[in-house]
């Protein structure tokens, strides 16, 4: 029988990524939902409380931000006001120590330069690790498939 500890980093055995308990999946779903709630509310402090000290933020159009201080500074500098985030196709896989979450999103936002609401459509990838009995976000990466004014229908929905 294969063990996750025996498998090399270059070849993840699929059985190792199907060991999350229902409770762990629910906990991760709750963390994801809270993140979105805090992001919309601009509650940076609560959002950062969900993160590990070695959090990594990998935006699609900028250099990665590594560590709590850099990620916190990036989030605080936000020039965009998020009005809502809709999540679809959320999937969570992992083991009892590490998990990943992938989902599609549709975000309604406005910028400090232009108050006209716009939309972004894309996907994001999260990696979470269980540390001292609690799940913590260790990496967030996302892609943007398209942008549109709120009055324009966005394809791919």
Q: Which role fits each region the language model picked out?
A:
Residues 6, 13-49, 56-157:
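A beta-strand edge to alpha-helix "cap/lid" segment located at domain peripheries
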């Amino acid at each position: 029988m294969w063990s996750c500890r025996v498998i090399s980093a270059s070849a993840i055995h699929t059985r190792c990524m199907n060991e999350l308990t229902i409770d762990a999946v629910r906990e991760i779903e709750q963390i994801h939902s809270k993140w979105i709630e805090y992001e919309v509310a601009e509650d940076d402090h609560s959002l950062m409380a969900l993160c590990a000290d070695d959090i990594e933020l990998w935006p699609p159009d900028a250099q990665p931000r590594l560590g709590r201080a850099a990620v916190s500074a990036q989030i605080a500098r936000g020039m965009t006001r998020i009005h809502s985030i809709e999540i679809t196709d959320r999937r969570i896989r992992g083991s009892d120590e590490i998990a990943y979450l992938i989902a599609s999103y549709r975000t309604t936002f406005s910028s400090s330069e232009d108050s006209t609401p716009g939309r972004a459509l894309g996907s994001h990838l999260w990696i979470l690790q269980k540390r001292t009995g609690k799940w913590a976000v260790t990496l967030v990466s996302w892609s943007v498939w398209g942008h549109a004014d709120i009055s324009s229908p966005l394809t791919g929905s």
